[in-house]
Amino acid sequence: MIWNNRLILALSLLLRLHLAISPSYIHPDEHFQGPEYALGNLFDWAHETTWEFRGDSPIRSFVPLWILYTAPLSVLNFLWKGQLSPREAYWFIRAGHALAYWILGDMALDRLSDSKKSKTKTLYLVGCSYVTWSYQSHTFSNSTETLLVLWCLVIIKESQQRHSMHHQRVHKFMDAGLLGLLIVIGTWNRVTFPLWLIVPGLTYLRKYLIHNISSLILLIASVALTAFFVIHVDSVHYDLEWTITPLNSFLYNSQGHNLAEHGIHNRLTHLVSNLPVLLGPLLILLRTPSQYWKSLQFQSAISGVFFLSLFPHQEARFLMPAVPLLISCYDINAVPRRFTSAIFLLSYVFNIIMGFLMGTLHQGGVVPAQHYLSKHVDSGSHTVVYWRTYKPPSWLLGIPEGELEILDKDHPLGTNLFKRVTDEIENIQIRHKKTMVTVLDLMGSSPEYVNDVIAALAPINPLLVAPVAGLKELDLPAYKEVWKTRFHLGLDHIDGLESLEPGLVVLEVL
């Protein structure tokens, strides 16, 4: 049994390494809420500034992006003598996210564990989770949120231990100051961050802070000073007065019609769908014996899941912090011993399938296609049409700012773009003659509409990026295949088994 566990752990480490650098594309937010904006601005690459960063009330803070992307990539670019490519930047930030979670996440879980047995169980099962292999290595703000939640809990736990052991006052002050700093960074990273700390925070206040007024005052001061600094930086960055992005985000998300644009879900979605999808068959081990009810991990998980379930927009990635927290509360003895091996085998199969699906296949051709196109379009004018793919991250093309025009549903043409995009054909041809690149995102368009657009653009030989499964629905003029990968699967247009054929191609219309 020990040998089997060690073998499985070794295989999970290999999967961690492989999926950390596999270019799957789980959700557009992993690009457009972080690298697209931060690195596009840093390197003056053409990029799309999404609505979160525009207007008089931006809802995304620049400070977490500066910490995660701008600062480290500036150093890397210096070491590369100013020759850093988008491809190298992409692999660096993906590997950085993976390593940060492997090192800092495991360290936090180690320090949160009450015994060697509990630590071994937690690190083993977290290491065997596909969420660790795939989601956590992607550039989601949720990935950062997970680490910040874990380390806030570490500080809370160790503060209470130091109080009972009468440690030096300087350690208590350092704990309070650092906790305040992390709370602000976490909140400005994601407005939902405090929800994970409400229940454990109340316990911390009742058992510790109420008896240590000096630490409470320092915690409040740390929060206030850090918040003031972040607000000042954001205000300067956006050239606005008193830009409080978490407040803007809260006000935006408190409006039902705004949430409706992103999708309205049943308030039980997190509980009955998202948690089982993230945790898999081992969710049955969450029997919650009395000792787990008292743990900070369980309190934090319940706090986050409960309060997030009050909001009608619910996506599985919102619960990423709950995965290591709840795994640490698993009770191996929750099921009869004769069923244990079967449940664990089922869990391994589940995580391998989900890991391969979300970590390798899911929209897995988009990023490699961008890497290919970055070399193909740097020598002249091109028009690239994307169909039935997630929104392509423009920064990966490495095109200088001002030389790329992006046409999609968020373009100033608005919905008219999808109604009569052919009205723009003449303008696209003009840009083509000026040695510019035009990206036309037709993700949700019908095959008939795509046929019309390609036919109108045929004189300038556009490139079409589309899934292999969708080509059968198109009636294209003569073309040649210039690039292809089999590691791509879109799950947004499933219509029978034929639509599940994997693959993404780049075609040049002749």
From Swiss-Prot:
Keyword set includes ATP-binding: no
Cell compartments where the protein resides: Endoplasmic reticulum membrane
GO biological process terms held by the UniProt record: GPI anchor biosynthetic process
Pfam families on file: Glyco_transf_22
Major site of localization recorded for this protein: endoplasmic reticulum
Membrane-related topology note: Multi-pass membrane protein
GO MF term set: alpha-1,2-mannosyltransferase activity
Enzyme class: transferase
Glycosylation site list: N142, N212
Enzyme Commission designation: 2.4.1.-
Coiled coil (UniProt feature): none
Keywords per UniProt: Endoplasmic reticulum, Glycoprotein, Glycosyltransferase, GPI-anchor biosynthesis, Membrane, Transferase, Transmembrane, Transmembrane helix
Pathway(s) of this molecule: Glycolipid biosynthesis; glycosylphosphatidylinositol-anchor biosynthesis
Entries under PANTHER family matching the protein: GLYCOSYLTRANSFERASE (PTHR22760), GPI MANNOSYLTRANSFERASE 4 (PTHR22760:SF3)
Function of the protein: Alpha-1,2-mannosyltransferase involved in glycosylphosphatidylinositol-anchor biosynthesis. Transfers a fourth mannose to trimannosyl-GPIs during GPI precursor assembly. The presence of a fourth mannose in GPI is essential in fungi.
Protein name: GPI mannosyltransferase 4
Gene: SMP3
